Design a protein with these regions (language model features):
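Catalytic active-site module of serine/aspartate enzymes centered on a nucleophile-bearing elbow/loop
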Residues: 99-103, 108-140
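Short beta-strand/loop motif that positions the catalytic acidic residue
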Residues: 61, 67-69
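Active-site nucleophile elbow and catalytic-triad environment of alpha/beta-hydrolase enzymes
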Residues: 41-57
Length: 140
């Protein structure tokens, strides 16, 4: 696990990179530990997505919506998912315990342990994901 000081440095680096991307600026020198999230090949994609407000987009949808949120997601917070649900009250919302951003089982918010789940293609989806998707798409 990261020490408190290292965790603070990591958080500052992430905030700084995100600020630059939100301003439409590429970040050429990304620390090695953050390359998986902010490598140069994904930065243009992230910049383009920062121009959208998910709450405004979901509010306009006239189709059924499924929101699956893991309580161990380090990229999208539970609060963010709840804001989506509030913006689209008819959405089918599920908070799934011990699930991360990749919808894999994960019982920690420790960055290193999380990254291990990101890079292991053998790990299956969380057991509830397919059940909830099947129920959602099977609704009349």
């Amino acid at each position: 696990a990261l020490s408190s000081a290292a965790s603070d440095v990591y958080k500052r680096q992430v905030r700084s990179i995100n600020t630059s991307l939100k301003e439409g600026k590429l970040v050429p020198d990304v620390p090695i530990g953050l390359q998986a999230l902010f490598r140069s090949s994904v930065q243009p994609y992230m910049i383009s997505w920062y121009t959208y407000n998910p709450q405004e987009i979901i509010k306009k949808l006239k189709v059924p919506v499924l929101i699956l949120q893991g309580d161990k997601d380090m990229q999208v917070s539970v609060k963010d998912a709840e804001l989506l649900k509030r913006s689209q009250p008819s959405a089918d919302y599920h908070l799934i315990g011990n699930m991360n951003h990749l919808m894999k089982t994960c019982d920690t918010m420790d960055q290193q342990k999380q990254m291990a789940t990101y890079t292991d293609p053998a790990l299956p989806l969380h057991k509830d994901v397919l059940i909830l998707i099947e129920k959602f798409v099977s609704k009349p």
